[in-house]
Amino acid sequence: MGFSDLTSDAGLKQLNDFLLDKSFIEGYEPSQADAVVFKAVGVAPDTAKYPNGARWYKQIATYDLATLPGTAKEVSAYGPEGAAAAEEDEIDLFGSDEEEDPEAERIKAERVAEYNKKKAAKPKAVHKSLVTLDVKPWDDETPMDELEKAVRSIQMDGLVWGLSKLVPVGFGVNKFQINLVVEDDKVSLEALQEELEGFEDYVQSTDIAAMSKL
């Protein structure tokens, strides 16, 4: 299906609904998909009518669109798709009572066992969050390249570092802002912040600027 006219109310509502549980058009980081849709929207959506679209538009506006990764496609290639047909193999768990015989019962039992085996083999859902983290240095003399190396040196099971940038905060000081994806059951954000603040030569404090479930 994809996005339609993103300058119309219907198109903006479609975008707003699509972004209800997403931070970006595709994946966990900004890409050319966001750049294409951003250009198609043209102007910032009304915050009152389209809060999700407005949030996304404001965030993408902070990036240099030409540098975002990926390959640009037509705007209709992005967005909601038709509901996929269920891929579950359907089996008849309820046979007719009219033709009960040992062979039919054996086949039915095999089908039930196979069905239960498939259900048990399905992997459990992994809950993830997309987090934008602000890392604040001590002053304008803090070496930000070394600060970034220190941040990215932290490795945890269930933690994936993403894109980062420097954001001016005044008086020549920049804060380091970075996106990350965490598996909720494996990574404690509080523990991560404590570890980051352990780099006392570079880091004054950390804050969670934004967070959304994936």
From Swiss-Prot:
Complexes and interactors: EF-1 is composed of 4 subunits: alpha, beta, delta, and gamma.
UniProt-listed GO biological process terms: cytoplasmic translational elongation; translational elongation
Keywords (A to Z) from UniProt: Elongation factor, Protein biosynthesis
CDD domains according to UniProt: EF1B, GST_C_eEF1b_like
Protein name in the entry: Elongation factor 1-beta
Protein biosynthesis among keywords: yes
Function noted in UniProt: EF-1-beta and EF-1-delta stimulate the exchange of GDP bound to EF-1-alpha to GTP.
GO cellular component, one term: cytosol
Molecular function via GO: guanyl-nucleotide exchange factor activity; translation elongation factor activity
Matching Pfam families: EF-1_beta_acid (PF10587), EF1_GNE (PF00736)
InterPro entries named among the record's database cross-references: eEF-1beta-like_sf, EF-1_beta_acid_region_euk, EF1B_bsu/dsu, EF1B_bsu/dsu_GNE, Glutathione-S-Trfase_C_sf, Transl_elong_EF1B/ribsomal_bS6, Transl_elong_EF1B_B/D_CS
SMART domains listed in its UniProt record: EF-1_beta_acid, EF1_GNE
Protein family per UniProt: Belongs to the EF-1-beta/EF-1-delta family.
